Amino acid sequence: MSWPILTSFMRSWTTKPPPQIKMSPMRLSWQEPFFDCDFFCGFGQVIEAKERCFPSVKSRYRPPHAPPVRLPRNRKGRTGARASWVGVKSRKRGGGLLGTFTPLYSKYAFLGALRSAAQMVPYEVSIGLILIVRLICVGPRNSSEIVMAQKQIWSGIPLFPVLVMFFISRLAETNRAPFDLPEAEAESVAGYNVEYAWDAILNSPLLAEANVPGXPGTHSDNKITLFILIGVDACRGRELFILHSKLMNVGWKVFLPLSLAWVVAVSFLQILLLFIKAHPNLRRDYALALSYHLYNWGSSFIDGFFFWKREKKNFL
């Protein structure tokens, strides 16, 4: 096959959707690219006979005019994750729904994709706020500098509640059990097949770079990864299936306010530490005043929580 013929053939495949195959009265499939080309596939055989909901990244079909994904580079020219990881990872919500031609082929899969995207939005907002907490505490934006800044003390120790929220949000965003609601409806609409092929690629390095300490040795390579895997499998075996309404309530009413509160608290502490460093003679007085106010605020919050828990039937 000559080069002009190959380029014209590829141009025709990238400017129009692939031909449809009617599997049954209610099922449609799509032929793979280059399925009828002897040079690529042999004797005109289909590459894979698996049924496709629609052409997507998972079916190895690139939509027309889809921009390539490029990792950000630092000043030294090396590729490294920065705060733009959040922006790159957030593109899959709207881009996956708008760039995969779902409404043209399967309205039920499109409804399932909307439900899956609605599940991921509140937890992604919480993850963005949690990453802001990390950046406020550590300072630099480069992921390698965030890891190296945790040589002295692991940030998961003082920020343990943030780490727990981060872990649960990752489980919910990647549709892991017990948050596998899109996969639970696979037999009816298969909506989770509409989205997303970026989760496994982008979530894993972001979770590792934001939480793994930078101390060298075997304990920072294998044991922490094994601990995270054991925790994911333990959640799969321990927790049961939960309702979609409870999942959305946890994302919007619990994790989002807590993450906002942590952003405000960490920002206040950082400003207070900078002020104390600028006025070393007032350290003792400000420390006593801060401890007194924190004790009052904490006791008031605990009393109010137990009062609401005791009298919530009257409120409802």
From Swiss-Prot:
It comes from the Eukaryota. The keyword Mitochondrion applies. This is NADH-ubiquinone oxidoreductase chain 1. Pfam families: NADHdh. Disulfide bonds: none annotated. It comes from Citrullus lanatus (Watermelon). PANTHER family: NADH DEHYDROGENASE SUBUNIT 1, NADH-UBIQUINONE OXIDOREDUCTASE CHAIN 1. The keyword Zinc does not apply. Belongs to the complex I subunit 1 family. It is found in: Mitochondrion inner membrane. One of its GO terms (biological process) is aerobic respiration. The gene is ND1. Its main location: mitochondrion. GO terms for molecular function: NADH dehydrogenase (ubiquinone) activity. It catalyses: a ubiquinone + NADH + 5 H(+)(in) = a ubiquinol + NAD(+) + 4 H(+)(out). The chain crosses the membrane at residues 120-140, 153-173, 256-276, 288-308. Core subunit of the mitochondrial membrane respiratory chain NADH dehydrogenase (Complex I) that is believed to belong to the minimal assembly required for catalysis. Complex I functions in the transfer of electrons from NADH to the respiratory chain. The immediate electron acceptor for the enzyme is believed to be ubiquinone. GO terms for cellular component: mitochondrial inner membrane. Keywords: Electron transport, Membrane, Mitochondrion, Mitochondrion inner membrane, NAD, Respiratory chain, Translocase, Transmembrane, Transmembrane helix, Transport, Ubiquinone. It is a multi-pass membrane protein. Its EC number is 7.1.1.2.
